[in-house]
Amino acid sequence: MNDVKLTVLGGEGTGKSALIVRFLTKRFIGEYASNFESIYNKHLCLEGKQLNLEIYDPCSQPQKAKFSLTSELHWADGFVIVYDISDRSSFAFAKALIYRIREPQTSHCKRPVESAVLLVGNKQDLCHVREVGWEEGHKLALDNRCQFCELSAAEQSLEVEMMFIRIIRDILTNFKLKEKRRYSGSKSMAKLINNVFGKRRKSV
């Protein structure tokens, strides 16, 4: 059974916890600010594989708070970044989160494969008071090699489920790519060792 670790991030009041609960239970819980971090578990079958999905929901943070994401970057295989389409400040916070996730690829937290990231514009049911355009979200995702979608945790149970399946598929694709690179690296090392020691054997 494959373990898939997913972290859901976003500013306070964006509905990230509501998205998780909607996916796990099909119910909409409304919005609340949690002072506790939670890890949810779900077993599912996807692409013929049995998966143990762990979803990490950190405690709500004010959007102006400083954040490092160091532990999340080391733990998670992928990220869902949530903003509220009716709150421009939440979009700015989502942008900062994406920049932070992408930045480590060239520093201390370098990975063989870039983390899967899905940017989600939540509360599509509030489009009459929209402050962030669809095009803005799409461009931010495109510029930072992320997937993108808009939806409503309050009204769209199926869309929420498909959103999570989408990021999980991206993570599984990354697993295959890592394994392929690991196998290719092992073959290259074996060939190098054979070349070095093979030549020595011939010269003896």
UniProtKB/Swiss-Prot annotation:
Q: Which InterPro entries match?
A: P-loop_NTPase, Ras-related_GTPase, Small_GTPase
Keyword set, alphabetical order: GTP-binding, Hydrolase, Nucleotide-binding
Region of interest: Small GTPase-like: 1-204
Q: Known Pfam families for this protein? A: Ras
GO terms for MF: G protein activity; GTP binding
EC class name:
hydrolase
Which residues are listed for GTP binding in this entry? 10-17, 57-63, 122-125
Task: State which Enzyme Commission number(s) the record gives.
Answer: 3.6.5.2
List the catalytic activities from the record. GTP + H2O = GDP + phosphate + H(+)
Record's function text: Binds GDP/GTP and may possess intrinsic GTPase activity.
Family membership noted in the UniProt record: Belongs to the small GTPase superfamily. Ras family.
The protein's name is: Ras-related and estrogen-regulated growth inhibitor-like protein
Organism this protein belongs to: Bos taurus (Bovine)
